[in-house]
Amino acid sequence: MNSPLRRLSTPTLLSLAVALGLSGCAGLPDQRLANEALKNGDTALAEQNYRQLADLGYSDAQVGLADIQVNTRDPALLKQAEATYRAAAQTSPRAQSRLGRLLAVKPDATEAEHREAEELLKKAFANGESGTLIPLAMLYLQYPHTFPEVNAQQKISQWRAAGYPEAGLAQVLLYRTQGTYAEHLDEVESICKQALSATDICYVELATVYQTRGQTEQQAALIAQLRSAHAAGRVNAQRVDSVARVLGDSTIGTPDEKTAQQLLEEVAPGYPISWVTLAKLLYDFPELGDVNKMMEYLNNGRAADQPRAELLLGRLYYEGKWVPADAVKAEEHLKKATATEISAHYYLGQIYRRGYLGQVYPQKAVDELLTAARGGQNSADFALAQLFSQGKGTLPDPVNAWVFAQLSLASETPQATELAQAMSTQLPPEKLATAKDLLAREQKVRGASATQNAMAMQALQEEKDGEEAL
């Protein structure tokens, strides 16, 4: 790293020297402390130290600060992160890599930004930066029209033939993106067994493989290995949380919710996000605890400023399952989660659409549901189609009803199919051309599917977590 001291003025150097002389190391920003705090989920302490070092000109600390902003997934903070990466990229190859990775998953990015991302990632890869092939592969997979000259599978095969360590994981990502993961479990297992010691995201992939197959002995051995690696500091709490989510996922083979709960309770005191994961696990498996346990988990998560805790608490008041239904409290908690949690917009939209606050608020419902739909919540398209077809609180709009009914087909549910057929019947023939044009425009606004964007953002996060500390 280029020494930031060379770029500081004499008065600044003098002030820094005086501070060092008067206080020694006590109270001074500490990058190692920031790294450890971030690894353990204490983003406030990490941000405090990174920010102070970043203000002194340390490019690695600037990158660390931007990483925290990226982790929030808050649109406003993502813009700040992009600006921070750009500023640091003038002297830091790591920042160049981060900028490329962020542009690769940036919502509503332009074709020029995607091309810039490719250039930055290729440059970073040539400079030996890790974590570049996964977002590069995602670029090619998500935006084939921008890169018509690139065949993603051929490119990944070339990387694997050249022996690049990340290439195997790029292949796994391709299977996930194309929906063929279940057809390649043997290959995923082989790739991740070889890469496990170097890339801990493979704990998640192997847990998925073993749970899908129902291989309980292999799963138990993997969990024991994970616990040992975490105790030794080789695997962070976030990875343990990710594995626990697989164990508690009822859509993947036969879940092991009790082991998931044990893992999460082990790491939650030092990794507050896991309190919310515990609450969601209890929501899915009520036999694991009672309402008091649920509130304990959620209050711990809220105390650590976790938006997902606000989302889940709002959902509880919305549904009236664990606590008495209360639309006012639901709205209050859901609003606190909207900056980072797309689902919060969906539930708010439903509150306004269904009149849970005493009357229907059609425009508020449309605004919230459209935000949710464009963020990847397929059920929001279905709700919008219902709103425009039923005309509850507003006049029926058969054109908009048809458009959102067509978009809701992505959820592949019988209800969506039935609604789409009904809307096609009700749409006047002379308005079909207008409806198709509106559908095309809405699809263009959404660009790459939000599900893929979410997957890409997750890939960015997972790859970054696998790197060495800044």
UniProtKB/Swiss-Prot annotation:
Q: What is its main location?
A: membrane
UniProt-listed GO biological process terms:
alginic acid biosynthetic process
| Assigned keywords, A-Z | Alginate biosynthesis, Cell outer membrane, Lipoprotein, Membrane, Palmitate, Signal
Where in or outside the cell it occurs: the entry states:
Cell outer membrane
> Span of the secretion signal?
1-24
Lipid moiety-binding region (S-diacylglycerol cysteine): C25
> Membrane topology for this entry?
Lipid-anchor
SMART domains the record matches: SEL1
Pathway info: Glycan biosynthesis; alginate biosynthesis
Query: Sites of N-palmitoyl cysteine lipid linkage?
Result: C25
Q: Which cellular components does GO assign to this protein? A: cell outer membrane
Role played: May be involved in the polymerization of mannuronate to alginate.
The record's section on PANTHER family has: ERAD-ASSOCIATED E3 UBIQUITIN-PROTEIN LIGASE COMPONENT HRD3, SEL-1-LIKE PROTEIN
Q: Which family does it belong to?
A: Belongs to the AlgK family.
Q: What is this protein called?
A: Alginate biosynthesis protein AlgK
Q: What are the leading ranks of the lineage?
A: Bacteria, Pseudomonadati, Pseudomonadota, Gammaproteobacteria, Pseudomonadales
